[in-house]
UniProtKB/Swiss-Prot annotation:
TM region(s), chain numbering: 26-46, 55-75, 100-120, 140-160, 198-217, 238-258, 278-298
Alphabetized Pfam families for the sequence: 7tm_4
Topological domains, Cytoplasmic: 47-54, 121-139, 218-237, 299-318
Protein name listed in UniProt: Olfactory receptor 13C2
Membrane topology: Multi-pass membrane protein
Disulfide bonds: C97-C189
Glycosylation sites: N5
Residue ranges, Extracellular side: 1-25, 76-99, 161-197, 259-277
Gene Ontology BP annotations: detection of chemical stimulus involved in sensory perception of smell
Length: 318
């Protein structure tokens, strides 16, 4: 009987929007368009940060990493989600679910840390402009970006390994679009208090600590901006931070609402799962990567000029 109750699962069923075929078709079209915008927008930012010598600075190096990160993050989930919208059998193998869970968590953690690094870069640029070339030299900002990726990979590997080792019962229905780690963890028929503790520690270290760094950095930046006597100087200083601050508010506002809101095991796996959670999850997974290049391009003259230069060069080369 114990063996029957602890069946070895080989696949999971992603419920998503099952039972709403019209909504699935609508979401397929919308998400496909958004994914194309994500690839084009973030791909353009990566190209200009590499090809334009004027953008070979720490700020745009971090921005290029952020754009590449957004492409990787969405590619781990959107294609499979689109396929599931058109497929009657919405299943994913255990190994495929583990890979998707690892990549999604790794990219999310990396983005949190990277946004903290970018805030520190803006702090040094505005509050210590004379020492900026020394503090944010290539020997500093390249390891900072690499460290963000390493932290994301290590954190995700540790959490994913602990989750896949859990015993799963017959219930293999994930009431989500993707293999989100918390939704998968709640399917286990074992005590998950250790996993929850590890997740709490990871959340504190890799989500809240970068957020604290961002808050401290921007508090000092605001104080420095108010000390600038000329209105032109204040405007120039604030414009260099407005795009990053907007991205931070959208990213952290969404992620904190998703993961800080208490959820019970019954709520995560019930048929009447709060639709707001799914909408916010979709917003976090698609809208944020799509908006990042738009925000940076609309609020940054250097990016606009670099895009124009790239387009003109391609046009005249033909």
């Amino acid at each position: 009987m114990e063996w029957e109750n602890h069946t070895i699962l080989v696949e999971f069923f992603l419920k998503g929007l099952s039972g709403h075929p019209r909504l699935e078709l609508l979401f397929f079209v919308l998400i496909f368009i958004m994914y194309v915008v994500i690839l084009l927008g973030n791909g353009t930012l990566i190209l200009i940060s590499i090809l334009d010598p004027h953008l070979h600075t720490p700020m745009y190096f971090f921005l290029g990493n952020l754009s590449f990160l957004d492409i990787c993050y969405t590619t781990t989930s959107i294609p499979s989600t689109l396929v599931s919208f058109l497929s009657e059998r919405k299943t994913i193998s255990l190994s495929g679910c583990a890979v998707q869970m690892f990549l999604g968590l790794a990219m999310g953690t990396t983005e949190c840390v990277l946004l903290g690094m970018m805030a520190f870069d803006r702090y040094v640029a505005i509050c210590n402009p004379l020492r900026y070339p020394i503090i944010m030299s290539k020997d500093a900002y390249v390891p900072m970006a690499a460290g963000s990726w390493i932290i994301g990979a290590v954190n995700s590997a540790v959490q994913s390994v602990f989750v896949v080792q859990l015993p799963f019962c017959r219930n293999n229905i994930i009431n989500h679009f993707t293999c989100e780690i918390l939704a998968v963890m709640k399917l286990a028929c074992a005590d998950i208090s250790d996993n929850e503790f590890i997740m709490l520690v990871a959340t504190t270290l890799f989500i809240l600590t970068p957020l604290l760094l961002i808050i401290v950095s921007y508090t000092l930046i605001i104080v420095s901006i108010f000390k600038i006597s000329s209105s032109e100087g204040r405007s120039k200083a604030s414009s260099t931070c407005s795009a990053h601050l907007t991205v931070v508010i959208i990213f952290y506002g969404t992620i904190l609402f998703m993961y800080m809101k208490p959820k019970s095991k019954e709520t995560l796996n019930s048929d009447d799962l709060d639709a707001t959670d799914k909408i916010i999850s979709m917003f976090y997974g698609v809208m944020t990567p799509m908006m990042n290049p738009l925000i940076y391009s609309l609020r940054n003259k250097d990016v606009k000029e670099a895009v124009k230069h790239l387009l003109n060069r391609r046009f005249f080369s033909k």
